[in-house]
């Protein structure tokens, strides 16, 4: 069982199906898997080096039901997580979070936490490229929203209200899902945030 720093225990997900997994183009691929696949594609083509950040966990208790098998039964998050992904593209530091919802009209802001917002602000302070990838699974729509607009909306009431899809459409950029890369977000960064054309 994994516990958060404030000692609240997270529900165990061992041997339970993960809810909310969405099929894309009948391939049974989750949003996170599509992002990871896209990052692998960019890396293999020498376009960018972007990886999912590991979550630092402190193991507290391990059971050994068999001599050759160990089972972690209790652990704690060492620190609060920041964002999901980071890396470098053409000398620019890239940092982003990915969120998914089945709602059709808004993105729940409860999915974002104050320490993540503070981290994004710090990245922007250092002139890094920071954003969120927002996926509406019921609509099969994905958007890249610059972190500055997420931060602005979050500060209205500390993330108490959901972000309307209309706000995301007004300030963000739609991403058309495709074969490879599945989520071509680098094209948006290049064309909208850097003003150039990506060379593949």
Curated annotation (Swiss-Prot):
Localization, UniProt: Cytoplasm
Pfam family, one: RecU
Annotated binding of Mg(2+), by residue: 82, 84, 97, 116
Cofactor-binding details, from the entry: Binds 1 Mg(2+) ion per subunit.
Positions bearing the site annotation: Transition state stabilizer: 99
Gene3D superfamilies in the record: 3.40.1350.10
The enzyme's E.C. designation: 3.1.21.10
Cell wall biogenesis/degradation is among the record's keywords: no
Role of this protein: Endonuclease that resolves Holliday junction intermediates in genetic recombination. Cleaves mobile four-strand junctions by introducing symmetrical nicks in paired strands. Promotes annealing of linear ssDNA with homologous dsDNA. Required for DNA repair, homologous recombination and chromosome segregation.
Matches recorded under NCBIfam families: PRK02234.1-1, PRK02234.1-2, PRK02234.1-5, recU
Family membership: Belongs to the RecU family.
Annotated protein name in UniProt: Holliday junction resolvase RecU
């Amino acid at each position: 069982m994994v516990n958060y720093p404030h000692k609240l225990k997270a529900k165990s997900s061992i041997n339970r199906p993960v809810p909310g997994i969405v099929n894309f183009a009948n391939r049974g691929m989750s949003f996170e898997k599509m992002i990871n696949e896209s990052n692998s594609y960019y890396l293999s083509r020498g376009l960018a080096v972007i990886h999912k950040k590991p979550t630092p966990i402190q193991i507290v208790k391990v059971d050994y039901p068999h001599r050759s098998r160990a089972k972690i039964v209790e652990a704690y998050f060492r620190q609060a997580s920041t964002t999901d992904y980071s890396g470098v593209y053409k000398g620019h530091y890239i940092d982003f979070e990915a969120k998914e919802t089945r709602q059709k009209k808004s993105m729940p802001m409860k999915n974002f936490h104050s320490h993540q917002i503070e981290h994004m602000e710090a990245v922007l302070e250092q002139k890094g490229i920071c954003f969120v990838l927002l996926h509406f699974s019921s609509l099969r729509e994905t958007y890249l929203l610059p972190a500055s607009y997420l931060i602005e909306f979050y500060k209205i009431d500390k993330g108490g209200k959901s972000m309307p899809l209309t706000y995301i459409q007004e300030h963000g950029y739609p991403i058309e899902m495709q074969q490879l890369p599945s989520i071509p977000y680098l094209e948006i960064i290049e064309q909208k945030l850097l003003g150039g054309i990506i060379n593949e």
